[in-house]
Amino acid sequence: MRSSRCARLLLLLLLPPLLLTPPAGDAAVITGACDRDPQCGGGMCCAVSLWVKSIRICTPMGKVGDSCHPMTRKNHFGNGRQERRKRKRRRKKKVPFLGRRMHHTCPCLPGLACSRTSFNRYTCLAQK
């Protein structure tokens, strides 16, 4: 009698958390921790957290009207002349970006551009 009561109580205590826990595949989306773009799902990139600069999280790419930053591709591999030349050659803004992003925003979605809308303010807008 007592063991069945304990079993029922244990079931009542453990069942709600089990029902509210997401499947194992979705757990990465909740934490969002990443190191590089390929670890994030489609339409997202791995960007620096706003709150803790040493952590990178999966962040959605910019949609029309979202604020953006023109240097979202900036990484911290060397600052020499060779690196600047390489950056000039690869102007395409692709995701996944294999470097480490140094800003908290992702590039705009394909077909959009990060355009200056006012002094020191950039927004994702349709490319002309």
Swiss-Prot record:
Pfam families membership: Prokineticin (PF06607)
Compartments where located: Secreted
Residue span of region Disordered: 71-95
Protein name, as recorded: Prokineticin-2
Function: May function as an output molecule from the suprachiasmatic nucleus (SCN) that transmits behavioral circadian rhythm. May also function locally within the SCN to synchronize output. Potently contracts gastrointestinal (GI) smooth muscle.
Any one cellular-component term (Gene Ontology): extracellular region
SUPFAM superfamilies attached to this UniProt entry: Colipase-like
Keywords carried by this UniProt record: Biological rhythms, Disulfide bond, Neuropeptide, Secreted, Signal
Main location: secreted
Organism domain of life: Eukaryota
Disulfide pairings: C34-C46, C40-C58, C45-C106, C68-C114, C108-C124
Biased composition (Basic residues): 83-95
Originating species: Bos taurus (Bovine)
InterPro entries: Prokineticin, Prokineticin_domain
Recorded family membership: Belongs to the AVIT (prokineticin) family.
